[in-house]
Amino acid sequence: MKGSGRCRVSDTSMFTNLRADKELAGKTQMEILQDLPYSLCQPGPANVDGVGNYYLQIFGAAPSTRPVATIYLLDSHGQIPSTTNVNRNPDYEPIKHSQIAWFWSTSQALRREREDNGDADSFHTSIVFQHIPLPEFDDPKLIMHAGCRGEPTEGPSQNTYFYDALVGAGVAAIGCGHDHVNNFCALLPEQWRKKEKAGPWLCYGGCFGFGAYCEYDGKRYWRRARVWELGVGMKDDEEEGVVRTWTRVEYQKERKGEIVLVNNDTVQGGAGDSYGSK
């Protein structure tokens, strides 16, 4: 956060098990984040579980007032004793039903607003970010594209089916962290077979910080950060309606595992041969 302030870059944050497990109350933490220079953090509705369930809209170049993307950020809570018969340790709280209801009502209200403003046929994409992965990230049938699985998915054993709400709302991708040496983007088979209007893509960010582990089972992985690029046609060489992602790897300049998630305003599925580990 300090680095982004020095560079005068707007930033935002979501709550994770790393903050939820601390003594400082979430509300107080959010107040601190809001006071930082260039911070876009918001506390979110008081009647929704967790702190920091909110959305940000990205608009086209001025003088346009048309939103080209909506970014949703959700609190993924903290660690809990296992709630299933499976000996699962650690286990984590799932996304709560109040959060799913908030996401659905908000996304549909924003959709209706775009329709009322005559923007229904214009490019718009939605991306969700949360720290702890959904249970779907652990599906053994995932079709991976760009990147690899370096460790098992560590997420909630209880599935509250937030993924189904993402499908219904037409979300292009969900990005998460938590599992430091996973860095893939993937689709469930039923979404892959759609060829188009698939999604959401399930994308890991990889290990970014130097204060965290970056190895598993004795194997070291390069630290990396996932970059998301949204094309809105502001530049002559920029494609409108395209969303790309890749990882920037420690000590390397080239893009790794670059993939087009959305092309011509359509979430892509079955896009070709999967990428190997990079």
Name each model feature, range by range.
Residues 1, 7-8, 14-22, 80-82, ...:
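Active-site environment of divalent metal-dependent phosphoester hydrolases
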Residues 2-120, 223-229:
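Extended active-site neighborhood of metal-dependent phosphoesterases/phosphodiesterases
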Residues 6-12, 16, 55, 70-74, ...:
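Structural recognition of the beta-strand scaffold that forms the well-ordered cores
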Residues 23-29, 87-88, 142-144, 188-191, ...:
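Short, glycine/charged-enriched secondary-structure capping and boundary segments
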Residues 50-52, 67-70, 124, 170, ...:
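Residues that flank catalytic or metal-binding motifs in active/ligand-binding sites
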Residues 55-59, 182-278:
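Binuclear metal-dependent phosphoesterase catalytic core
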Residues 70-72, 85-187:
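His/acidic metal-ligating clusters that form di-metal
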Residues 75-78, 132-134, 206, 249:
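Short, small-residue-rich loop/turn micro-motifs
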